[in-house]
């Protein structure tokens, strides 16, 4: 029987994560927690607010932040730190439809979504979203708490600081440095 995992957040990104987790088939979804929603998400129960995480820990040792990131990583960082403090395991979730080189490294709590590609020598930090069809090229470094959005391209040797939101279809030219907490608009070319 597979290990259980709880998703912290119950919005759109949670739906995408559910799809990846079901396809990956490494974890059984225990449920979701969310401060603003109740009911169900794609057939999985919203168990309550994040105040119940301490209780859940005895039944479910794994968790992932399922809140997306637009403009600021503050909420994702706060939830990630809370999960670490409570002693949850924060596994890397990788879609079987993604490609991750055996020569790349990925930090705890990061989600690599469908059709994303992380090439040799790339390093991705903790608590990141590498979204659908995103490309992280050779030797690029993505800091902690970043959201690399759908169909975006981080070319070789790029350095992405912590907390960056990199918009859909944006491209970073080889070797550039993107300062921490930057917001790169969709379809931009960052040079």
Spans of model-derived segments:
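Hydrophobic, well-ordered beta-alpha structural blocks that scaffold small-molecule cofactor pockets
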Residues: 1-44, 54-55
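Small/polar loops that bind or transfer phosphate-bearing groups
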Residues: 9, 67, 174
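Alpha-helical elements of the RecA-like P-loop NTPase motor core of helicases
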Residues: 15-19, 74-77, 144
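Glycine-rich, phosphate-binding/catalytic loops in enzymes
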Residues: 24, 80-83, 146
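Conserved acidic residues
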Residues: 30, 61-62, 162
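Phosphate-bearing ligand-interacting subdomains
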Residues: 38-95, 99
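Structural signal for interior beta-strand "rungs" in well-ordered beta-sheet cores
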Residues: 92-191
């Amino acid at each position: 029987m597979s290990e259980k995992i709880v998703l912290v957040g119950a919005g759109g990104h949670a739906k995408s994560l559910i799809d990846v987790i079901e396809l990956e088939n490494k974890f059984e979804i225990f449920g979701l927690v969310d401060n603003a929603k109740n009911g169900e998400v794609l057939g999985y129960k919203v168990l309550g607010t994040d105040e119940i995480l301490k209780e859940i820990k005895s039944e479910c040792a794994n968790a992932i932040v399922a809140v997306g990131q637009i403009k600021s990583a503050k909420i994702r960082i706060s939830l990630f730190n809370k999960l670490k403090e409570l002693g949850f395991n924060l596994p890397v979730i990788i879609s079987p439809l993604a490609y991750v080189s055996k020569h790349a490294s990925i930090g705890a709590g990061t989600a690599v979504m469908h059709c994303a590609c992380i090439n040799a020598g790339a390093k991705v930090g903790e608590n990141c979203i590498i979204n659908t069809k995103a490309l992280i090229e050779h030797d690029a470094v993505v800091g902690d708490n970043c959201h690399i959005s759908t169909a975006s391209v981080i070319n070789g040797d790029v350095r992405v600081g912590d907390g960056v939101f990199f918009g859909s279809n944006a491209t970073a030219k080889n070797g550039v440095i993107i300062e921490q907490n930057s917001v790169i608009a969709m379809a931009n070319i960052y040079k």
